[in-house]
């Protein structure tokens, strides 16, 4: 009981200190942003005057109001008013926007294969009665007790699955039941899917595959069990009255 009170007081002090630091707001520094003293380039109104001679319609060396070396009002090296490398109008360099976009990095392209793989991992597989597909694993290194099977596995491991099908661990009373069910559904699905592609498995393949999948299912059970207990511990922690009171007080301080 004493330890519980001590832990509650420590948590209260920690949250109070954290909230005090989080509520401190930085005051903006006086002055403007970068280069507020005026531009050093032509035609931009520097208070101290430009360092270049006054120009009529265009920039330095421009007869017709364009950028440097432009006869007809475009960007640098543009004959017809477009971005650099664009002969007939447009935006900034290599794109249809303004010149302010020249230095913007291009947006990374989304790899749809990675998105699909991330969505499939841990998701419920349709048509399999609530089974989920685990994340990809490295195939385990297994010794089968004889040189022939060891060599056969090394040469053919790419033909065996690197993901397993499983149900949530809370549906099983122990690890053995989870692993047994996981092995059966994974081997069945892999053999059926691969057979439809014209590839057949021998008895040696099935024997080795069952051993490999068994090790992967054990690993999957350990991962799921650890995550399950962590979720349970988090629920117990945040459902206790002292923690609820402290969280409510913290929200009040932030919102207020």
Swiss-Prot record:
Glycans are attached at residues 184, 200. A lipid is attached at residue 233 (GPI-anchor amidated alanine). Residues 234-256 form a propeptide. GO terms for cellular component: Golgi apparatus; plasma membrane; side of membrane. Pfam families: Prion, Prion_bPrPp, Prion_octapep. It is a lipid-anchor; GPI-anchor. PANTHER family: DOPPEL PRION, MAJOR PRION PROTEIN. The normal, monomeric form has a mainly alpha-helical structure. The disease-associated, protease-resistant form forms amyloid fibrils containing a cross-beta spine, formed by a steric zipper of superposed beta-strands. Disease mutations may favor intermolecular contacts via short beta strands, and may thereby trigger oligomerization. Contains an N-terminal region composed of octamer repeats. At low copper concentrations, the sidechains of His residues from three or four repeats contribute to the binding of a single copper ion. Alternatively, a copper ion can be bound by interaction with the sidechain and backbone amide nitrogen of a single His residue. The observed copper binding stoichiometry suggests that two repeat regions cooperate to stabilize the binding of a single copper ion. At higher copper concentrations, each octamer can bind one copper ion by interactions with the His sidechain and Gly backbone atoms. This is Major prion protein. The gene is PRNP.
